[in-house]
């Protein structure tokens, strides 16, 4: 009888606790934690086109927070905007980072369309893109949202795709309106504008929302500027106002956060309801005004002009700067991580997205305000190198660097930026070369990226998404010697 070698015991699956945010990369995005919005990874693929911003399964409240294009992920819940096509909504968690569309009460949604819950459906905000670009901040693309639920205005869909062109488009792309109040919000400029557009433009306002629509998100090469609404995530009863860029959510809506204009950007207004955000930015770096009673929806203030600006700015110009459009999506009750993004080529601190809950639970990274060209921390530094940190404990955690900034031709950061060179980090970056890290970038190849981010760019890789509680890190660092992992 021949001797048989004993097979080694298989390795156990590595995962995080139920409150942890998601791992995974390359298109899939990781599973969300308990309050997490799930991974908002966006697949890159060879053409980058139609790369959905959806990701793994969400947690208990995170279900269906992905904005996947084609096939439609998640189903709309009673008060969620979602359903059909590339629905995003579902549960209380709402969207992951990047161009996720919020759902449930969160409304946040980060990059692309924001909406969900009472604010009217984001929907149709899959990060589809052109033939070669990842579409970057395209909203819509490939089908649109199924439509409205009881209190939802139904969003995007139809012709309101924001896909980029074959030249790498990125940036806002076309209009991403939709819904009763939406429509007409032109996001994005010509020839790959990248940072010129917002990542999503206005999401349609819901039944009780004034929201979205109307606000121009820049255009051409100069990008935002003025009232570059970017992704107006009007939500709730207060609605979001044309140039509002914040991702309001739940009942409060994003009405409070206005978009700064001019070359200096400027900070936005505060949040509308209870959970006000502490603004550390201001000036050219923009402040982080967040909105949302139940959740914040990404940053708010939108810088304009050439200096980009802070917050989830939809602004930015040829010089890049914090032209991100929505930071991390507001997830669950905690709102999004990340926060505003530093503007200008020198970056700057930006504001750290903080609410009563995220400030208590944020752990990845540790309330780092960073800024500068390398970004880091909750702040997403602007400038060409982008950077940007992950979300907090309960943030939806998707979108790579949770609302990275960047944009312009040099890319950098994630955000809605992404010019010819695309952008790294989170957000809806993209461009001809795609963006590494999270976001809805795509580029020529897919590729990974840690955390909930989804890669893009030729080499993949990129920054990781928001992670969960520290136990998640401990789990990843431990290596039990008793398991033969060969």
From Swiss-Prot:
Single GO molecular function: structural constituent of cytoskeleton
Comp. bias regions, Gly residues: 451-468
PTMs per UniProt: Substrate of transglutaminases. Some glutamines and lysines are cross-linked to other loricrin molecules and to SPRRs proteins.
Keyword Aminoacyl-tRNA synthetase annotated: no
Chain positions covered by the region annotation Disordered: 451-486
Organs and tissues of expression: Expressed in the epidermis of the ear (at protein level).
One GO BP annotation of this record: keratinization
Keyword vocabulary terms for this entry: Disulfide bond, Keratinization, Repeat
GO cellular component: cornified envelope; cytoplasm; cytoplasmic side of plasma membrane
Known function: Major keratinocyte cell envelope protein.
Note: Transgenic mice expressing a C-terminal truncated form of loricrin exhibited, at birth, erythrokeratoderma with an epidermal barrier dysfunction. 4 days after birth, high-expressing transgenic animals showed a generalized scaling of the skin, as well as a constricting band encircling the tail and, by day 7, a thickening of the footpads. Transgenic mice also showed retention of nuclei in the stratum corneum. The mutant loricrin protein is found in the nucleus and cytoplasm of epidermal keratinocytes, but is not detect in the cornified cell envelope.
Protein name per the record: Loricrin
Native organism: Mus musculus
């Amino acid at each position: 009888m021949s001797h048989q070698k004993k097979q080694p015991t298989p390795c156990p699956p590595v995962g995080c606790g139920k409150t942890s945010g998601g791992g995974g990369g390359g298109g899939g995005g990781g599973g969300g934690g308990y309050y997490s919005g799930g991974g908002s990874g966006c697949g890159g693929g060879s053409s980058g086109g139609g790369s959905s911003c959806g990701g793994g399964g969400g947690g208990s409240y995170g279900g269906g927070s992905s904005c996947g294009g084609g096939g439609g992920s998640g189903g709309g819940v009673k008060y969620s905007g979602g359903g059909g096509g590339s629905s995003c909504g579902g549960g209380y968690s709402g969207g992951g980072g990047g161009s996720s569309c919020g759902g449930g009460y969160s409304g946040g949604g980060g990059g692309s369309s924001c909406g969900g819950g009472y604010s009217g459906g984001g929907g149709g905000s899959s990060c589809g893109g052109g033939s070669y670009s990842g579409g970057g901040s395209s909203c819509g693309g490939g089908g649109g949202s199924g439509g409205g639920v009881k209190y939802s205005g139904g969003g995007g869909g139809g012709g309101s795709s924001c896909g980029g062109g074959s030249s790498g488009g990125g940036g806002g792309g076309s209009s991403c309106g939709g819904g009763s109040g939406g429509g007409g919000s032109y996001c994005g400029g010509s020839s790959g504008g990248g940072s010129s557009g917002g990542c999503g433009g206005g999401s349609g306002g819901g039944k009780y929302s004034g929201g979205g629509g109307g606000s121009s998100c820049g255009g051409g090469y100069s990008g935002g500027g003025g009232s570059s609404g970017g992704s107006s995530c009007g939500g709730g009863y207060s609605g979001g106002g044309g140039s509002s860029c914040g991702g309001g959510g739940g009942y409060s809506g994003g009405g409070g956060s206005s978009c700064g204009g001019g070359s200096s950007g400027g900070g936005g207004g505060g949040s509308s309801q209870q959970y006000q955000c502490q603004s550390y930015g201001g000036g050219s770096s923009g402040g982080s005004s967040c909105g949302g009673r139940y959740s914040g929806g990404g940053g708010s203030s939108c810088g304009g002009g050439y200096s980009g600006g802070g917050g989830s700015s939809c602004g930015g110009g040829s010089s890049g700067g914090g032209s991100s459009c929505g930071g991390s999506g507001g997830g669950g009750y905690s709102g999004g991580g990340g926060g505003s993004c530093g503007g200008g080529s020198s970056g700057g601190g930006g504001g750290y997205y903080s609410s009563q809950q995220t400030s208590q639970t944020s752990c990845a990274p540790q309330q780092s305000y960073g800024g500068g060209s390398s970004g880091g921390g909750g702040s997403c530094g602007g400038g060409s190198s982008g950077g940007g940190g992950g979300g907090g404990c309960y943030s939806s955690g998707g979108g790579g660097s949770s609302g990275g900034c960047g944009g312009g031709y040099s890319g950098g950061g994630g955000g809605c930026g992404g010019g010819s060179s695309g952008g790294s980090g989170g957000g809806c970056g993209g461009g001809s070369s795609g963006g590494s890290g999270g976001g809805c970038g795509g580029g020529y190849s897919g590729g990974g990226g840690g955390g909930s981010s989804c890669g893009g760019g030729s080499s993949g890789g990129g920054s990781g998404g928001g992670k969960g509680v520290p136990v998640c890190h401990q789990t990843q660092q431990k290596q039990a010697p008793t398991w033969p992992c060969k």
